[in-house]
């Protein structure tokens, strides 16, 4: 499929669109499910008075929740996929808004349930299981609802905190408005001598320029307004951190990190192991950066030189037809069952391929328990799009395995686990491409693509995670979070990670433009996810049939166990350091291969 001017939705060939008729043959099915959900909302709300009467009543309510949730989830997915395929279609936007409004109503009607389960004593909780053995099918779900026991205040106190939630979100909202709407950048001069206004959107183009003067000007121009507003950004970030620490304190946690990780049942050892091993392996990052410097022929490397491609443009391209066939072939190491799911994805038209006018940008995998796991793409004949395709196929296969193994209540998976399956696929594709494209330039490009992803995901996100924890600890210990103290903390960590790079003064204020620091200990999961995926893909490619079966069992597990326990069964104990060392072994091997090719 060639890259052409985007088509109108009705002009896209049917074979390049997803088949939503597999959900509902027409909107009539959507309307029927929506009406059913609305009819059940009063019963869901009224069950507050009866559901906890005894074990049988609780089981009946949980089964009702499953049925209603399945219907609203299906209706919502159908409507949001239709809305995303053409955002200019008002009828589909209205459909999506109606489904979302109904979902909010349903969520409100069932909101009483989790606090009610949480309020039970351990004895009362276990009594329900004695009365009704059928509740064992829901035990993990119910126990997960109780993980905050001991960390919940009285109803009156929680209600008071809830009313203050908008206040606690104020710093993040202010940052987003500043960063996305109010910040304006000066013009820069391009390689062609043209004056253009710098934006957050086009910055990546100019920071990758082959002209160092363009890179330097883009870098300095980007940071100028952030430095001008450094006290304001220090105030928003400091207030955000104080909010996290306050919430943790009043809810009886030792720290904000403990509170944030507890909600996903992730032990703090996972975080510490990541930071420890990445720090131990920083010499590998320094080696990769030295290779970049040598390839660019620079006497010294600045922060604005780190994003220049060192292997040129991609020497290989795939159109969609080629990529679809190659993806099925590339993922064969995942076994016959996985292979059949890949063929099914194409045969049953799970994938909406072509870019069209009004289509949502980017790519994703989305589905409900009772639907196929659909994939949205905006295809261009570029190698990066091939990686996006196998990435999203990884999410969809994960969803398919989970939903075809687990009951509704365990039929999805946590954010902590989500990126592992998709990144595993990317790593397996890298191995396939290295075997298929053996000429020197292709090998260099594929290897550097992998190393750059590893650097951006594991090294950089761990750097962010280390800084995020540092400023939370500073505040908890009573140290003021001023622009000076924040910049000092950031620059010290950055200098450690990029020890062989000139520390341009602007980089001390990089923290001011990073939205992840307002996401409360979220960013580390990018790094743990890729590290686990790297270790797992290596086991799949070079291990035993038992290694593959353990991986497939992770795909099947859903929410049937805590995320850390699911990964242990897959062969990766994320509370220990072994999987991280395995991942860095792969990185070092790939780095040595690229070093050898670049020195020829």
Residue ranges and their predicted role:
Residues 1-312, 596-600:
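A well-structured
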Residues 10-12, 25, 113, 117, ...:
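C-terminal, non-catalytic "cap/extension" segments appended to globular domains
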Residues 295-333, 339, 350, 374, ...:
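Long, K/E/R/D-enriched contiguous segments that form extended
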Residues 313-318, 351-371:
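Catalytic zinc-binding patch centered on the HExxH motif and its immediate surroundings
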Residues 316-320, 368-390:
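Short pre-active-site segment immediately N-terminal to the catalytic Zn-binding motif
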Residues 329, 333-340, 363-366, 395, ...:
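Conserved helix-loop functional segments at active or binding sites
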